[in-house]
Structures are given as structure tokens and as C-alpha cells.
């Protein structure tokens, strides 16, 4: 039987331990911000909540969401970017320009070392915003042409090509599963992943083009239409800021792919810190088989 005196000492010790440990554990959580509100994909409210859940479930992030007005410009859209370690964009094609003050604040935030993640149609947004296109490296649609920058892809013989040929930026075929090929297995985002793995049903973006400055292609997917290996994961250095860009993630089912979930969360952590400790899960897809987790949406 434990004496009252011993029990009191034990409880006191536990209290000291919790006092010491809890703040440290809380400090490990990074603050993330998802911005959304205008997207040509009608499921954007669901994908915002899915991505929020993925980040929070990793136990690495706390997440806030700031939503732009649904139509036209929104003078009140002024997120406090500096309060966050990473910003995730779930905007899409045709999104109205942000207020000039907000654009400048975002540029300063990323240039000064803030993290940024561009998901799927976020690379359709803001074709006239020079700094934004430098951040995402490559974009599509919105009138992007050879004036926007080169096409970037891998050839069959494994060479990275910067193609300045004339033509529009951005295209995709019917949705289907497709294979992802890792091009840099040593990068913190891709380290430990299979050399090739199957991504679930999605749009395979092709013919993206843009400044492609300070950009590394981490992974590609072969596009039968272009006969090129199109970028599916990219990192871009913008000033002191780190950017992770994935064109994947069209539909809810696309974002339920364990490959998408893992690369998205790892990409966000890398953008925020430059390091990754989120593990590659046991149910990660293989070269032969996709793997998905049904979400509540």
C-alpha cells in the first residue's frame, strides 16, 4: 500500500514533469495557414478540410484557414502571414488578384524565410503576378505562354530539359492512376520513398511552364500525350523561403492517396523548417499498387 506521504511526492514529481515537458511538446507544433476561397474546383471546401486534417493528424502542425471572398477582389483579405511557419494555397484558376498590400506582404514573408506550399490548381492562379510565378516555378493556364518561361520536363534518357518552344502552358488528360518516379531520392521530402509508386486517380498536369528559377524537380510522371516525364513534385528557393509545389490533388479521391498525403505533409514540414521527420507510412503505395485512406470529407 502506497503511503499518503509517498503518493504526495509522486504526484508532485509528475506535476513537475508535465510542467517541463508539455510546453516543449507544444512548441514542436508548427503554425500553418491554408488560404482559399476562389478555385475552379468545386470541391475546394472539402480539400481544404482534408489538408487541414492531414497536417494536424501528423502531430507536427496547428492549422488556421483564411478564406477570400467567393467572387471578385476582396480588400479585407489580409492574412497575417508572419504568424505562420508555412502557408498552403488552395486557390485555383481564375482567382481574383489579392490586394496590392497583401501581395507585397506575401512576397516579403516568403523572401524572408517563410514556407509556401502550392497544391494542384494553385499553379493556375495569378499568371500576371511576377513574384508568385517565381515562387511556384511552373504554372499553367491563365494565358501562360513561352513569354512566361520554358517548359520543364525529363526526357526518356533521364535528362532535365528546359524547352523554350512556343506554346500554351498547362494541359491535362482524363483522370486516371499514374506512376510517380522519384528523381532525387536523397531530398528530405522523398527520402525513404520507393523509387516508383502508383498515385491514385488524378489529373496528370502537363506542359507547365514558368520562370523555373532555383527549382529542383523531385519527382515526375510519364504523360502519354506529351511523351514527356512531367514534374509532379518541385522545390523552389525564393529568397530565404522554401517552396514545395505539387500539381497533384485534383479530386477528393486524389487527395486520399497515401502518396499525396505523405508528400504534402512532408513538403509542408520541409518548407517550414528545411527538415523532415514525418515517416513514410507502412501503407505507402508501391510500384504496382495504389493506396488510399477514405476521409470523412
Question: What are the roles of these predicted feature ranges?
Answer:
Residues 27-30, 46, 56-57, 79, ...:
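Extracellular ligand-binding/catalytic regions of CAZymes and related secreted enzymes
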Residues 11-21:
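Bacterial N-terminal signal peptides
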Residues 96-188:
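A glycine-rich, often tryptophan-bearing local segment used as a flexible ligand/cofactor-contacting loop or short
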Residues 56, 62-64, 72, 153-239:
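Catalytic beta-strand/loop cores that center a nucleophilic Ser/Cys/Thr
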Residues 2-12:
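Bacterial N-terminal signal peptides that target proteins for export
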Residues 38-41, 165-168, 175-177, 249-258:
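Active-site rim elements
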Residues 22-26:
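Sec/Tat signal peptide C-region and signal peptidase I cleavage site
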Residues 27, 31-126:
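Helical hinge/lid and interdomain linker segments adjacent to catalytic or ligand-binding clefts
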Amino acid at each position: 500500500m502506497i503511503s499518503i506521504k509517498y503518493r504526495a511526492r509522486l504526484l508532485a514529481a509528475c506535476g513537475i514533469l508535465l510542467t517541463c515537458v508539455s510546453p516543449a511538446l507544444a512548441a514542436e507544433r508548427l503554425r500553418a495557414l491554408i488560404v482559399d476561397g476562389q478555385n475552379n474546383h468545386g470541391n475546394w471546401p472539402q480539400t481544404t478540410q482534408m489538408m487541414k486534417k492531414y497536417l494536424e493528424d501528423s502531430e507536427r502542425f496547428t492549422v488556421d484557414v483564411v478564406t477570400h471572398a467567393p467572387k471578385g477582389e476582396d480588400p479585407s483579405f489580409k492574412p497575417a502571414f508572419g504568424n505562420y511557419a508555412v502557408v498552403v494555397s488552395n486557390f485555383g484558376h481564375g482567382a481574383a488578384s489579392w490586394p496590392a498590400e497583401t501581395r507585397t506582404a506575401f512576397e516579403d514573408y516568403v523572401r524572408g524565410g517563410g514556407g509556401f506550399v502550392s497544391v494542384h490548381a494553385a499553379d493556375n492562379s495569378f499568371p500576371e503576378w511576377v513574384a508568385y510565378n517565381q515562387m511556384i516555378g511552373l504554372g499553367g493556364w491563365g494565358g501562360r505562354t513561352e513569354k512566361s518561361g520554358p517548359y520543364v520536363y525529363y526526357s526518356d534518357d533521364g535528362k532535365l530539359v528546359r524547352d523554350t518552344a512556343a506554346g500554351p502552358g498547362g494541359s491535362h488528360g482524363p483522370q486516371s492512376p499514374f506512376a510517380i518516379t522519384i528523381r532525387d531520392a536523397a531530398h528530405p521530402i522523398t527520402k525513404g520513398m520507393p523509387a516508383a509508386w502508383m498515385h491514385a486517380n488524378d489529373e496528370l498536369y502537363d506542359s507547365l511552364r514558368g520562370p523555373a528559377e532555383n527549382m529542383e524537380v523531385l519527382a515526375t510522371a510519364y504523360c502519354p500525350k506529351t511523351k514527356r516525364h512531367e514534374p509532379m513534385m518541385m522545390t523552389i528557393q525564393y529568397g530565404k523561403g522554401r517552396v514545395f509545389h505539387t500539381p497533384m490533388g485534383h479530386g477528393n479521391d486524389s487527395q486520399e492517396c497515401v502518396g499525396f498525403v505523405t508528400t504534402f505533409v512532408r513538403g509542408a514540414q520541409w518548407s517550414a523548417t528545411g527538415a523532415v521527420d514525418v515517416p513514410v507510412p507502412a501503407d505507402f503505395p508501391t510500384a504496382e499498387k495504389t493506396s488510399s485512406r477514405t476521409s470523412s470529407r
